[in-house]
Amino acid sequence: MERKTVLVIADLGGCPPHMFYESAAEKYNLVSFIPRPFAITASHAALIEKYSIAVIKDKDYFKSLADFEHPDSIYWAHEDHDKPEEEVVEEIVKVADMFAVDAITTNNELFIAPMAKACKRLGLRGAGVQAAENARDKNKMRAAFNRAGVKSIKNKRVTTLEDFRAALQEIGTPLILKPTYLASSIGVTLIKEMETAEAEFNRVNEYLKSINVPKAVTFEAPFIAEEFLQGEYDDWYETSGYSDYISIEGIMADGEYFPVAIHDKTPQIGFTETAHITPSILDDDAKRKIVEAAKKANEGLGLENCATHTEIKLMKNREAGLIESAPRFAGWNMIPNIKKVFGVDMAQLLLDVLCFGKEADLPKGLLEQEPCYVADCHLYPQHFKENGQLPETVVDFVIESIEIPDGVLKGDTELVSFSAAEAGTSVDLRLFEAFNSIAAFELKGSNSNDVAESIKQIQQQAKLTAKYALSV
């Protein structure tokens, strides 16, 4: 069979490059379009070059030789991408036409809506224009969820301080304030007290002015205020060590939802995720309720052909509360870990759906559990405040070393990999915690409880050597 050609809009996020490009190139010819060259790391650029039959970079972002250099690491691109949505759509269509591509995909949430419009214009399978807009604007997303038959929650659009005051009066506290257009929990804030609510709103509103997003990202209001979803851990888990929410990965094919795998989580730092354990140890009844909620949510958004990453709060009486869903792959190493545990390559599966629809080899339900658990974990400065190695009052520090001591792993849990920020790395604690991962590690074991306990022990006992000054 002749290999089909797929256009990849290359940028940050989703399935990590170290898996995506090799997996995709095994079955498909890849053309990579890079709309934001400054958002591509050196290692990402090398993989793009290695596995693509052609690479197209937006010429407007090259003014000097320095612009051809790629950073070693990047979490969020802070340079301006000032092209309006229609211009981005035109560029995608132009590159797609040039190579007569059979499908278009991206791992970056910020380009989902322009990509959907390009797919429609070209007659290619995609998420769907209205569905992509629903999924990218959290106000529209919540409205779609509330219509879809999942748990309905109070919410209000917020643009101004007056809007926020009105939301406080209607919803009360605790209240969640979310930017409608970002990802990775950036800017998500829990408002607990009426007395400090306005100050919190002003702080977040001011901080978000420093978070650059492409001009093509559009929204009707910059914030959504939502009723807080209260978790009820003991109604779902029989043992400690996990969190009161999960994520479920799935695939939409011709408007139908196909669940793939559920990830358990370890307790968060605020709204910053700390670890994902694949697969979930929840019982069959719990998994069924989660799948039902995810199906209603993603089909309720109107999604047609795409990957889905859906986050669900585990509430009282086993009610599944929809946090949000995105028409893209999960980040971190969640997609590679599905392949490690189950042998299913979701990168290839998505491209199969985009090229062949329901002729793809779609799962008949959640993948069956293998006798293996894999955990994808990060350490943050807050962990070292909690274990006493950083004073609470520190606002910045310089890393000298981070180490995991011997004897902290439980059962047959193995430390598969560990990486830490280089000596000399400066860390600014005034940033949202999500920006400040300072170490990452992967664990593998035959017992999920042992893996979860090993994560906890590492969080409590990892050794940080750092330089800092305390305010007088």
UniProtKB/Swiss-Prot annotation:
Mg(2+) 2 binds at residues 311, 324. Its EC number is 6.3.2.49. Pfam families: ATP-grasp_4 (PF13535). One of its GO terms (molecular function) is L-amino-acid alpha-ligase activity. Gene3D superfamilies: 3.40.50.20, 3.90.1170.60, ATP-grasp fold, A domain, ATP-grasp fold, B domain. Pathway: Antibiotic biosynthesis; bacilysin biosynthesis. PROSITE patterns: ATP_GRASP. Substrate binds at residues 273, 309-311, 328-331. Part of the bacABCDEFG operon responsible for the biosynthesis of bacilysin, an irreversible inactivator of the glutaminase domain of glucosamine synthetase. Catalyzes the formation of alpha-dipeptides from various L-amino acids in the presence of ATP. In vivo catalyzes the ligation of L-alanine and L-anticapsin (epoxycyclohexanonyl-Ala) to produce the final bacilysin antibiotic (L-Ala-L-4S-cyclohexenonyl-Ala dipeptide). Monomer or homodimer. It catalyses: L-anticapsin + L-alanine + ATP = bacilysin + ADP + phosphate + H(+). The record marks 332 as: Plays a key role in restricting the N-terminal substrate specificity to small amino acids such as L-Ala. This is Alanine--anticapsin ligase. Mg(2+) 1 binds at residues 109, 182, 324. Residues 142-355 form the ATP-grasp domain. InterPro entries: ATP-dep_AA_Ligase, ATP-grasp, ATP_grasp_subdomain_1. Its cofactor is Mg(2+). It comes from Bacillus amyloliquefaciens. Keywords: Antibiotic biosynthesis, ATP-binding, Ligase, Magnesium, Metal-binding, Nucleotide-binding. GO terms for biological process: antibiotic biosynthetic process. Binds 2 Mg(2+) ions per monomer. ATP binds at residues 138, 178, 184-185, 226-229, 268. Signal peptide: none annotated.
